[in-house]
């Protein structure tokens, strides 16, 4: 079951809300159907003995050292960065009061781990939840569920450009983005008590969109390890066309403007080459460029 909650009661947004709800439901259902047929992501508790032992050791040696549980004070608002988290409820005994903690999933850690010699992998969220007793050895696990926060990318320009250089402007803008309002909250639970708990803990607005299902962060499926796929299942890589001359791009665009078509044309032979020439040209005083987003190993950033 999937629950989609909207606090904003505005007739003008009804059509938009319905479209978002339908798309989200289709996305989750199609992934469940696809994974049921192909078994690309297997629950940790369904692994056979040898695979389960390897996964457990991988958790202890590679995953556990980078996890840091943080205590939650229910009387205070949680101001978390955009990302994926686990909320864990524990207690020492039945007579002991309940303790609430969250675990941030580091961005640098793989969301899916391929099992050696197998054509499937395990989810990092499932792996961590399966090993919570190892993390909280002196406490009993009551419940746990993941959630993902997405904050608005919009910032309001209140920067004094005359007093801050470009680097300081960027740093200040990025910090402001991390404090911007939460646009979307994905909750990996359909329990009303869990949804209510997060709604009380996080600084949500009336127009924050809340998704509740058994899955969160399906966008991370794009990072499924390639080794679990057979060659016939892998997408054919498109080779960009090299249409720009091998000579200087500076000389080429002196005669006329040129519109580059990506990814049809080679990005390396157009944009990257243009910036490299600009960096080496002694007549170029400065390079100013606005990037919406970059790849993990961006040549432009390098």
Which residues does each predicted region cover?
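N-terminal localization/anchoring segments of enzymes in phospholipid and broader phosphate metabolism
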Residues: 1-302
């Amino acid at each position: 079951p999937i629950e989609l909650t909207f606090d904003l009661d505005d007739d003008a947004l009804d059509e938009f809300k319905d479209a978002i709800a339908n798309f989200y439901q289709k996305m989750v259902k199609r992934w469940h159907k696809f994974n049921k047929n192909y078994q690309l992501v297997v629950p940790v508790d369904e692994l056979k003995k040898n695979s389960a032992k390897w996964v457990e050791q991988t958790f202890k040696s590679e995953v556990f050292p980078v996890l840091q549980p943080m205590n939650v004070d229910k009387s205070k608002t949680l101001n978390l960065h955009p990302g994926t988290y686990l909320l864990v409820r524990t207690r020492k005994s039945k007579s002991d009061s309940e303790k609430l903690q969250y675990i941030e999933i580091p961005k640098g850690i793989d969301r899916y781990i391929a099992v050696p010699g197998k054509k499937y992998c395990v989810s990092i969220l499932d792996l961590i939840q399966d090993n919570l007793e190892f993390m909280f050895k002196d406490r009993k696990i009551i419940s746990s569920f993941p959630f993902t926060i997405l904050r608005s990318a919009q910032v309001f320009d209140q920067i004094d450009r005359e007093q801050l250089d470009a680097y300081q402007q960027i740093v200040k803008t990025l910090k402001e983005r991390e404090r911007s309002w939460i646009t979307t909250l994905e909750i990996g639970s359909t329990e009303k008590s869990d949804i209510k708990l997060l709604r009380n803990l996080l600084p949500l607005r009336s127009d924050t969109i809340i998704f509740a299902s058994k899955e969160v962060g399906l966008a991370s499926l794009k990072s499924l390890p390639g080794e679990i796929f057979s060659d016939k299942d892998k997408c054919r890589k498109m080779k960009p066309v090299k249409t720009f001359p091998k000579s200087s791009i500076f000389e080429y665009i002196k005669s006329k403007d040129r519109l580059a078509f990506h990814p049809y044309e080679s990005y390396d032979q157009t944009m990257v080459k243009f910036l490299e020439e600009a960096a080496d040209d002694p007549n170029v005083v400065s390079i100013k460029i606005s990037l919406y987003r970059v790849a993990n190993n961006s040549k432009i950033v390098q």
